[in-house]
Amino acid sequence: MKFSVKNILEMEVCLALGCTEPVAIALGAAAAATLLPGLKFDHIHLIIDPNIYKNGLAVVIPGSGGLTGLDTASALGAFGGDAYGKLEVLSSLSPEMVARASAFLAEGRVKVDLREESGLYVKTTISGGGHVAESLITDVHTNIVSLMLDGEEVADPRLVATEAMSTGNKLAELEEWLRSLTLEDILDLTNELDEADLDFLEEGVQHNLRLAEYGLKHGSGLGIGKDIDRLLKQKLLVKDMTTSARMLTSAAADARMDGVNLPAMSSGGSGNHGLTAILPIWAIKDFIETDRESVLRAIGLSHIITAYIKAHTGRLSAVCGCSVAAGAGATAGITYLVGGDLQQVEGAIKNILEDLAGVICDGAKAGCAIKLNTAAGAAVQAALFSLQGVSVKDTDGIIGDSTRQTVQNIGDLSNYGMVATDKTILKIMRAKHKKG
């Protein structure tokens, strides 16, 4: 089956309020809660996969007043989530809703269990008023495949995907098609972007810029972006392409990981991927002669490359997708924008994958801003090196003789080579959580 660039944007690029893993938990709880209108909840039981656990454990939830936690995300979704809002499920949280969820949590009414099998999985069971409601999300953060009340399936076409319309099934088909593409095919797709697509891409820029501006103004989270700005003013750093990309991208991550109530335009199922795929390209445009259309086409290319690599590595894994997938997307977009040809775009992708392939994902948290800072800077560097004729040789390590082969190798590293790494990361994080 052949897809179009519009299909990629529709399925891979969307607004997300808050980190997508706790948001998926909130969505599952909100969906189950719709089956118990007006009833007092007695208990919530959550069963999740290891990577949802890892990415949802420590990140601040928007609108919560600084709260974190898997159980918190579930309670907030149940008491204040809009099940029809998808990744913006928590956009209407009020202080009263947060207070009710907090009281529910304080009474120990939420239980979280870990599913050993990998693959995105969020099962939420809510009991109340003598009834039991259940939702199940699989494969994709918004893909509700089942809603049940007292053991009976509930049909809600606005919430529950049929097998034919399942986001998970459609995404699997899209990813299979993406894996068949060459870099030349991907560059051709960029030429198919029409004015409506460019407007949508520009909307994503504006959303992610708002996060960056907030981070720069308030020093949210770790304050990496604001600190870079301070170092520039102290003349300890020089404002160039690399520093500008790092500052803008990390500032947005600072704000997002601190739970600021502003949505991000996500890419490949992750808001932080969206920040990395978009903002470095936007930052470097001021250093070259270019125009709106060229910048937005470069960002479109970045999203496609991000989706292409995620189709190989998997939605969630031990590999930091901001570094490997969105970082590669950004460097491809930068190279394209500065005037690079097919060979130079390929060289830039090889450069950044050689540089950052070993960066692990140890969950979403404030420290992600440091990783996005690194990815943004490396994306600029990899592009500039390639434009100067410097690219990693095909004989080096995991680098292949083409972008396709290199990305396949990264996929093997992620899906097979780092399984034990992922388990070890999770073991360390769970031990810390139990101590806390």
UniProtKB/Swiss-Prot annotation:
Transmembrane regions: none
Signal peptide: none
GO molecular function, one term: L-cysteine desulfhydrase activity
Example GO biological process: L-cysteine catabolic process to pyruvate
Superkingdom per UniProt: Bacteria
Family (UniProt): Belongs to the UPF0597 family.
Name of this chain's protein: UPF0597 protein DP0591
